[in-house]
Design a protein with these regions (language model features):
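Surface-exposed loop/turn segments and immediately adjacent short secondary-structure elements
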Residues: 1-110, 115, 119-123
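Short, compositionally biased segments
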Residues: 2-6, 144-152
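Electropositive, glycine- and tryptophan-enriched low-complexity nucleic-acid-binding patches
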Residues: 125-126, 133-149
């Protein structure tokens, strides 16, 4: 199928109505503490190996081989993102891979898509996820009277 057809299909499939990303009127200025190298290391160690790389082509195994050097570089980048609230443009991009479903796969809707995201971006996402989880564990059980993970 033509590249343009796939581009239009995935844009329509994943399009969301989001607020203007350039409008920072409601930005929180007093953020949580700085990101720690230990958070970066923990996030990096938690990323599954033997997975396809994102658009940057950097496999997670390279970060894991470089160990402390990679942690220091990723920590610096993650800290910059945390302070400026600006996500690198390359980290916002994903590569979509169509995988045919059973049957006749002549239409885009007969495929499922997976998205390949930069492993460096995943490190920051895992840090944010861990911080949100800690916050929710700390705040929500008191408010809701339930423990996360045991809602249903």
């Amino acid at each position: 199928m033509a590249l343009l057809v796939w581009q239009e299909y995935t844009e329509k499939l994943y399009k969301k109505d989001l607020h203007n990303p350039d409008n920072h009127d409601d930005v929180i200025t007093n953020l949580e503490p700085d990101i720690l190298e230990s958070e970066v290391k923990r996030a990096l160690e938690s990323i599954t190996t033997n997975k396809a790389s994102g658009g940057d082509g950097i496999p997670v195994e390279l970060f894991q081989i470089l160990k402390d050097a990679a942690v220091k570089v990723l920590h610096s980048i993650c800290q910059q993102i945390w302070k400026t609230q600006q996500w690198p443009q390359d980290w916002k991009r994903s590569v979509f891979i169509p995988i045919p479903k059973k049957g006749n796969a002549k239409e885009c809707s007969k495929y499922r898509t997976i998205s390949l995201t930069s492993h460096a971006s995943k490190v920051m996402l895992k840090i944010l996820q861990a911080r949100l989880q800690q916050y929710m564990n700390r705040e929500l059980p008191d408010a809701l009277g339930v423990e996360l993970g045991y809602l249903f």
